C-alpha cells in the first residue's frame, strides 16, 4: 500500500473554475485533485484529497492525517489562512511535514490577505503558481522526505 499525502482545501475552493476566474483561473477542484494524484503516483505515493468550508472539519482532517499515518500534508486553507490560529495549532500538533499552497499570489492582493497564520506551521509556502503550486508542493514534500520520482 503506497504512503499517503493528504491534500486539504478550505473554504470556497469547491468553487474553483467559476469563482473569480481572473484571480484563480479556470481549473476546477477536480482538476487539482487529478493533478495531485498524477504527481504523487510519479513518486509511488497516494493522495487523500479533502475539501471543506468549515474550519473544524479541516482540523479533523489534519488529525486524521496523523491517525492514518500520512507522511505529508498539502493545505490550501483558503480564507482561514489569514484568520485561523486553530489550523496553525493543528498543523503544529500533528508534526507531519506540511506545505501551504495558494493558487493566487496572496502577497500581491489586499493587505488583509498578506498575512498567513498557517504558513508558520508549514516547512514551505507556495503562492501564485496557479494549480501548478500543488504539483510543486507534492514534489517538494517528496524531496524533503527523500523520496525520488519513479522511472
From Swiss-Prot:
- SUPFAM superfamilies noted in UniProt: Type II 3-dehydroquinate dehydratase
Residues of the active site are 24, 102
Recorded superkingdom: Bacteria
Q: Which GO terms describe its biological process?
A: amino acid biosynthetic process; aromatic amino acid family biosynthetic process; chorismate biosynthetic process; quinate catabolic process
Q: Which EC number(s) does UniProt give? A: 4.2.1.10
* CDD domains with a match to the protein in the record: DHQase_II
State if Lyase is listed as a keyword. yes
Q: Where is this site: Transition state stabilizer?
A: 19
Could you tell me the keywords of this UniProt record? Amino-acid biosynthesis, Aromatic amino acid biosynthesis, Lyase
Molecular function via GO: 3-dehydroquinate dehydratase activity
Top enzyme category: lyase
Q: Catalyses which reaction?
A: 3-dehydroquinate = 3-dehydroshikimate + H2O
Where is substrate annotated to bind? 76, 82, 89, 103-104, 113
Q: Pathway, according to UniProt? A: Metabolic intermediate biosynthesis; chorismate biosynthesis; chorismate from D-erythrose 4-phosphate and phosphoenolpyruvate: step 3/7
Task: Describe, as the record does, how this protein assembles with itself and its partners.
Answer: Homododecamer.
Could you tell me what this protein does? Catalyzes a trans-dehydration via an enolate intermediate.
What PANTHER family does the database record attribute to this sequence?
Answer: CATABOLIC 3-DEHYDROQUINASE
NCBIfam families of this UniProt entry? aroQ, PRK05395.1-2, PRK05395.1-3, PRK05395.1-4
Q: Which family does it belong to?
A: Belongs to the type-II 3-dehydroquinase family.
Q: What is this protein called?
A: 3-dehydroquinate dehydratase
Species this chain originates from: Rhodopseudomonas palustris (strain BisA53)
